[in-house]
């Protein structure tokens, strides 16, 4: 069994990242997390090298004229085209559509493993943030084999490309830093996985 999934810091970091990508920065789920990242205390508790985290921490605190809720709206809601859509099927489906074949494959996998996960609204389950929240839930419930499968089959095949584009087009220092923190953290997880990451073609 992959030991990193059994550590408390895996579930905590997955839940923190998942919430920050999934919920508005003003929501009760994320407002305390936003404030924590604007301070320096979080770095000592994040399971990455302090030297790697230092520039990320500095970027979190960089001022921007655009308000954080406005940036979140622009990046995750619209009304204009999202610069880096957070749903897996947009990257994995040839037509770049929501509810694509990869979403259906995720749903089938969830059914086969008896996993029920409530979404905020009628949206695809393959949202980057919701997949991280699901990974945290699986780890917290000692379902480490399913957590590995979720990461290797349904998240890692597209998450690196999503994060690269997200960072390049974030347009706000907080979300640019969040993308970099996610990229560093997920790279560490992937390096420690036992099962191989599925190789899938990307269409964006």
What do the PLM-derived regions correspond to, one by one?
Residues 1-204:
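Charged, alpha-helix-forming regions
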């Amino acid at each position: 069994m992959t030991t990193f999934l059994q550590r408390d810091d895996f579930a905590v970091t997955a839940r923190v990242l998942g919430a920050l990508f999934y919920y508005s920065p003003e929501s009760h789920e994320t407002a305390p997390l936003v404030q924590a990242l604007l301070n320096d205390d979080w770095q000592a508790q994040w399971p990455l090298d302090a030297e790697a985290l230092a520039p990320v921490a500095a970027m979190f605190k960089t001022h921007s004229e655009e308000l954080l809720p406005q940036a979140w709206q622009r990046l995750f809601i619209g009304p204009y085209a999202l610069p880096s859509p957070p749903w897996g099927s947009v990257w994995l489906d040839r037509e770049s559509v929501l509810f694509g074949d990869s979403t259906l494959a995720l749903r089938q996998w969830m059914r086969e493993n008896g996993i029920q996960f409530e979404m905020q609204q009628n949206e695809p389950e393959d949202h980057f943030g919701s997949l991280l929240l699901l990974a945290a839930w699986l780890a917290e419930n000692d379902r480490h084999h399913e957590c590995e499968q979720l990461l290797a089959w349904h998240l890692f095949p597209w998450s690196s490309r999503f994060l690269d584009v997200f960072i390049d087009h974030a347009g706000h220092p907080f979300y640019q830093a969040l993308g970099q923190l996610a990229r560093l953290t997920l790279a560490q997880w992937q390096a420690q996985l036992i099962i191989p990451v599925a190789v899938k073609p990307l269409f964006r």
